[in-house]
Amino acid sequence: DAQESRGLGDVYKRQGAMGSIYGSFFAKNNFDVLCYDVWDEHVDAINNKGLRVSGISGDHTEKKIRATTNFNELKDRDLYIIATKSDAVGSVASKLADFDLSSAIVLTIQNGLGAAERIEKFMPTENVLLGVAQGFGASIKAPGHAHHNGMSMIRIGEINGGLTNRLTTIVNAWEEAGFTSKGFEDIQQLIWEKFICNVAYSGPCSVFKKTIGEILNDKDMTEVSIQCALEARKLGDLKKINFSFDNTEKYIIDFGNKMPLSKPSMLQDVEAKRKCELSSINGMVVTLGKELNVKTPFNSVVSSIISAREKEYIR
C-alpha cells in the first residue's frame, strides 16, 4: 500500500492541538506519522496510550501514531507539517534547515500572516507550501487528548502561486487521510481571507473573554469585531489581494455562526497565561497599518489591551 510506505513528519510544539488532529487522522489512515512536541507529558501519553481525538469527528484513540521530543528523529520524511503557533515557525525552520530536504515538502499551516517570511530567514522556500485550515477549532484537553469543534477544509497552495503536480500530490494525501482538501492557485487570497476572520475574533474574544457565539450575541462586541475586520480588509485591498467577497461584515458573521462554541487559540492562550499570536493577527494589522500609513484604531486598542495583560504573567 503506497500510504503505508509514505513517511509523514508532523511537526508541532507544546499544546499542539491542531497538529494532534492532523497527526491522528493521517495515522488512522495508514500513514507513517511521527509527531514532535516539546511537552514531555503529551508525548509520553501519546506513546503509552495513543492519541485521543474527540469532537465533531467522534471520539477515537489512535494507537498507530508515534511522538518524540527529539527533533533529529524527524529526519528523512517525505512531508513535514509545521502546525506551531506563528511565532515558533522560525524556530522549527532553523532546525529543519539542518536536514536534507531536497526530496521533501514542508507544509506550514498557521493563523495570521508572515509564516513564509519567518521560514525564509533560515532556509530556502522552493520546497515550502502554504496551508490554511478553514473552519477548524481545536484545543488540548489533557496530555494525549485533543478536541476539535470544526473541520471544514485544508486549503493548500504554492508560495508563488500556480497549480503544480506536487501540490496535487499533497492535496491527495490529505484527502486520503480523511480531510477535505483542495489546491488553490492563489493561496495569498485564502491566507488573507482567513486572516480577516482571525482578526475579527481572536483579539475581540481575548479582550472580552468570550466565545465566538457570545461575541455575535452582543451588538457592542460584534461592532468591535466587525471594525477590526474592516481595518484588515482595507489593508488587503491596498495590497491588491483578490478577495472572493465584497461584503466583509457578512463574511465574518457567516464564518462565526458556523462555530459559535469555539474559543480562538488566542483566547485559549490568554486563559492559560501563555504568550499568544498577537503579533501575527491583530498586532499585524497595526504593523501593516503603520507601513501603509493607514489608521487602525480598533486593532490598536485591542492589541494594547492584550499586550498589557500579557505583561502581567509573562516576564
Language-model segments: residues:
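Short alpha-helical
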Residues: 41, 87-88, 113-114, 162, ...
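Single conserved hydrophobic/aromatic residue that forms the stacking wall/gate
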Residues: 1-12
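Rossmann-like NAD(P)(H) cofactor-binding subdomain of soluble oxidoreductases
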Residues: 36, 60-145
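NAD(P)-dependent Rossmann-like dehydrogenase/reductase catalytic/cofactor-binding core
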Residues: 176, 224-315
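Internal alpha-helical scaffold of NAD(P)-dependent oxidoreductase catalytic cores
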Residues: 99, 122-127, 142-245
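NAD(P)+-binding Rossmann beta1-loop-alpha1 motif at the extreme N-terminus of oxidoreductases
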Residues: 10-59
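Short, well-ordered alpha-helices that flank and scaffold nucleotide-derived cofactor binding pockets
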Residues: 24, 28, 94-98, 121, ...
